[in-house]
């Protein structure tokens, strides 16, 4: 299955609690931290909810 790299580019400070929890659930901590996750519907939904805070790249 394909993988995606998710990078936190903006701070979740001052955002809604649901958005902050989503950032933590993805395993992102500090700014510019990155994680590689499987590309599935659940992860895509989480990324969509915080798309204004993260950047997404395909991993080969």
UniProtKB/Swiss-Prot annotation:
Keywords noted in UniProt: Ribonucleoprotein, Ribosomal protein
One Gene Ontology term from the biological process aspect of the record: translation
Keyword Metal-binding: no
Pfam families with a match to the protein in the record: Ribosomal_L30 (PF00327)
GO cellular component terms listed in the entry, alphabetical order: cytosolic large ribosomal subunit
Matching CDD domains: Ribosomal_L30
GO MF term list: structural constituent of ribosome
Family, as annotated: Belongs to the universal ribosomal protein uL30 family.
Assembly and interaction partners: Part of the 50S ribosomal subunit.
Xref: NCBIfam families: rpmD_bact
Protein name as annotated: Large ribosomal subunit protein uL30
